[in-house]
Structures are given as C-alpha cells and as structure tokens.
C-alpha cells in the first residue's frame, strides 16, 4: 500500500518539474541568465529517496536522502537535451544520473534509475563531474573524476584520476581503465576532444601533484593517447596557464567539452583564486587552434560567469563550475553551470557571441597600470562617440 503522503508530494513535485523558466533582466550582451535552476535536489524522483510502502515506512521518512544536484555533463541526443548530473547523497557519496528535456532551459526529468557505473577497484570511493563527448569513432564517452582513498592515517588524503566510460544511449555504460598520465601523479577536470588529432585520442588535462593542490601543475595541459581502451599520455603540453593575481592564480581546469568552431576550439573552463573567505571559482573561456589544439589563440581577461545573487550561497559558497554545454544547430549555446556545489543553472549564448567575446575582449594585462590604461582607452573612444 502506497503511503498517502506520496500523492501530496508527487503533486508538488510535478508543479516544480512543469514550471516555466524565463530570462532574467541580467544583461552583458554575452549570455542570458534564467530565473530558476534547471536541476535541484527537489527534482530527484521521490522513489529514489523514500520507501513508498506504508507498512514498512509508516511515517514516510526519507530513507536515502539527497543533498545536492550539480555539475552536469551535457549532450544533445535524439533531439533531447540530456544532462548527466552529479547527484550527492546525504552520505556524501556522489553518483551520476541522467535528466532530459525537449527544451534546454526547463522541464528536465530524471530517468527511472541513476547510472549504475561499476567500480574498477575496491578502493574507489567516489566519482563525479562527468564530461560527455560524442566522438567521431561512434561512441559517447564520459570522462570523470575518480577519487580513491590514499590508505593512510590522514583521512583527508586521497588520490584523483580520470575515469573513462562509454555508451551509445546514456543507459548502458562500458567502464574502461582510467587515464594514465606518465608525468602527472594525479588528474581531474579532464576533457576528451570529439575528433582525432594526428590519429590519436586528444585530451585536455589538469596535471596535479596532490588531491587539492596543483603544485607544479602550471594549468590546463594537452596530451594524446593511442588507444582509448588503455589510454596513456606521456607528454602534456600546457595551454591556458595559471598566472599571479588573476582569476586562475590558484588553479584552473577544463570545463565543458571543447566546441569546434570556424575560428578554433572554444573552451569554457574554470579558474580559481584564493580569498580571505576561501577559494572562489569562476568560469572563463579561451580558444585554441584547430590544427594545433595546444596553442591558445584567444583568451579574454577576467571571467565569463561568476556567482551572482543567490548563486553565491550553498554547500561551497562563492563557486560556479561547468562541465557541460550543448550547441544547437542554429548556433545557440547552452552552458550548464552549478552554483556553490548545490544546484544547476543554464546560461544561453551563441557561437557568434562567444567568439566575439573571446577575440575582441582585451586579454588580462596582468598589472594594474596596464589594466587601467585599457579602460582609459575604451573611455576615450566612447567619449569621442558621445
């Protein structure tokens, strides 16, 4: 017998799932923000959280709670917008779940079950932040962070690597061995390009000395692997690098799967700087050369997206993060970004707007005197027009 509370809660959830999502008044000429998040913990199906049987759950208590839904890979599949979200339980363990809609800004509903991804080893503790790539070899690849216990007395220590799985339908997944980078002890925030480069699988990487600190890792790397089923990268060339007193001073990493455009590979990434209140994550972009994807050919100064209003507050405040974007046939770009490790939003731009932003916004001049000069030059040109 189903508990009567289920019907009440199901009706409330249906109203949430069916609500319209409208643009806000926010304006910068680059992208539009939307009023509501596209995914939250309230979007999770009730039968994932509650035992619906009144006999075994007379008080209708939540048995397997959900803490947050955020950081989602994204792909257009069978004319539907599909998100592979990071879902975090009350027990802190993350798992992947597919939500889909026929619209890119609203109406996302989770499939009947989450993704059942097998572990490769017994010490694999957590998985999260999947990037999705529709590769020219015919497979959809998911590249994600795998967290393993370091097996030491310090419980805060862990080892991060890049896991790889592939699918044709986002339902049935084949787990492949983790990516091996011979010159980097740890990896996370890895993306796979959708095309072969010199006949090899091409990755943007993030070399790390430790689980949290990048150490000697200078920024976002680029490397090639001969075989995706046993992916090994020897050399990593640096692309977008960390710089002092910028949005990437502490660390940076790849975000959404790179987007191929006529002018280059459009990369939507994240940068991190330290503050008195902790790490601040923002989203920025850069463009790499089509034939030599390790060469940065445009990198505007500052951030593209930063925490705004209510986005500033959550489990890990003052953070925005992306690992998924979808490009429509008309050139519209849906950037799915999480705020404060709690919920998932969408910003909508276009290829033309993002390329204009990337190539025509001044690069970071790195010093206050030069940055003020950039601004004064803009002011002077505008005054001449007024």
Swiss-Prot record:
Temperature characteristics of this protein: Optimum temperature is 50 degrees Celsius.
Keyword Cell wall biogenesis/degradation part of the UniProt annotation: yes
GO MF term set: hexosyltransferase activity
InterPro entries, per the entry: Glyco_hydro_beta-prop_sf (IPR023296), Man_Glc_phosphorylase (IPR028583), Mannoside_phosphorylase (IPR007184)
Gene3D superfamilies hit by this protein: Glycosyl hydrolase domain, family 43
EC number: 2.4.1.281
Activity dependence on pH, as recorded: Optimum pH is 6.5.
Record GO biological process: carbohydrate metabolic process; cell wall organization
Keywords (A to Z) from UniProt: Carbohydrate metabolism, Cell wall biogenesis/degradation, Glycosyltransferase, Transferase
Pfam families linked to this entry: Glyco_hydro_130
Job of this protein: Converts 4-O-beta-D-mannopyranosyl-D-glucopyranose (Man-Glc) to mannose 1-phosphate (Man1P) and glucose. Involved in a mannan catabolic pathway which feeds into glycolysis.
Assembly description: Homodimer in solution.
Further remark: Both RaMP1 and RaMP2 (Rumal_0099) catalyze the phosphorolysis of a beta-1,4-mannosidic linkage at the non-reducing end of a substrate, but acceptor specificities are clearly different.
Record-linked PANTHER family: 1,4-BETA-MANNOSYL-N-ACETYLGLUCOSAMINE PHOSPHORYLASE (PTHR34106:SF1), GLYCOSIDASE (PTHR34106)
Family of this protein: Belongs to the glycosyl hydrolase 130 family.
Protein name: 4-O-beta-D-mannosyl-D-glucose phosphorylase
Organism taxonomic ancestry: Bacteria, Bacillati, Bacillota, Clostridia, Eubacteriales
